[in-house]
Amino acid sequence: MTITLDELRRDIDRVDEVLVRLLNERARCVCEVGRLKKALGVDIYQPDREKEVLKHVRDVAHEGPLGPEAIGRLFERIIDEARRLERRVVHGEMDGDLKPESLKPEI
């Protein structure tokens, strides 16, 4: 049996849904990190930690068709968004529920 384009697209949609759930789970962790950094008086930007994360994801990238450089670029963007969330937490711009309604776009 040959798989159809529609079937492949449905598979991609399912994977995308999982990715969104995982990214939101990561974002909730990031917000907690932001709260803790605020309480401890620690800077949001932690270049050594970012390098560590990027090295880790590039190292595990060899397990699939996306290579280390592509995965690194994706995670650079994820880290940028994480920093943005942490800034919003530190500056008190987010309410406690961390739902999308509380994540108003920056202007």
Residue ranges with predicted function:
Residues 1-107:
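Domain-level signature for soluble enzymes in the chorismate/prephenate branch of the shikimate pathway
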